[in-house]
Amino acid sequence: TIMGLFLKDIILKGKTALVTGATKGIGRGTAIALAQAGANIIAVGRNQTELDSLQKIIKKLKVKYHSFNCDVNDFELMKKYISKIKKLDVLVNNAGTNIPEPFLNVKKSSVETILNVNTKAVFNVAQLCANQIIKLNKKGGSIINISSIFGIVAGQNRTVYSMSKFGVEGLTKGMALDLAKYNIRVNSVCPNIVLTPRTKKYFANRNYNRYVKENTPLNKTVTISDVATSIAFLASDASSMITGTSIIIDGGWTAR
């Protein structure tokens, strides 16, 4: 299963979670993991075929499923959708992108694309969902922003990506302070490179496993399940005293 060892300890029954970027990779795996833990799922993505495919999986888990076919950069459409939600406890702010380029050759269009998706849209969706949680739920909620180890350290050919993810880290801490009085916890997860269809394509002409393992003390790569399990923990009441922090999922990469 997507979850792993601690599924039995993470109970999300009765909670509703909105997951952006839910059609593939970490977002898809997280939506399934949260559903396995009992959460009802609202999936946001741009590929209707994949949203329908996810629905078939989620429905088998006996929880509710709704989806919005929407680009997170479309603020007005996201606002329209989120304002219609009748129950919301958890946001997984996952949508993201990267265009690896050396600093001296970074295109202006790349900067705009990366910052719009990775930072501006994360801010906008978080603000919309936080207001909706406050409106609907006196008990508060949990917001998990998907960051990266490159929001903690730099990476070659990832200058703009790092800039965007460092922004997410600052956003997470600021939100945690401002939303604490509403009992809304805000945290981030910072995974190392996860092997997804997108990263497989990027590393097609490189020895991915060798590269990652040689730089990871635990000598293994991060999986979608590793990330989804941590997100489920932060979404659950088991993490009720955790806010304003980051869970680094990197096998020791950043400890060097």
What are these regions (language model features)?
Residues 148:
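Residue(s) in the substrate-gating loop at a strand-loop-helix junction
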Residues 39-53:
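Conserved glycine-rich Rossmann-like NAD(P)H-binding loop of the short-chain dehydrogenase/reductase
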Residues 102-103, 107-115, 212:
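Substrate-binding pocket helix/loop in short-chain dehydrogenase/reductase
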Residues 4-9, 153, 232, 243-256:
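Short C-terminal tail/terminal secondary-structure segment
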Residues 126, 164, 172:
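Active-site helix of classical SDR
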Residues 16, 23-25:
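Conserved glycine-rich cofactor-binding loop
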Residues 180-185, 242-244:
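Short, small/polar-rich loop/turn modules that mediate ligand/substrate recognition or access, typified
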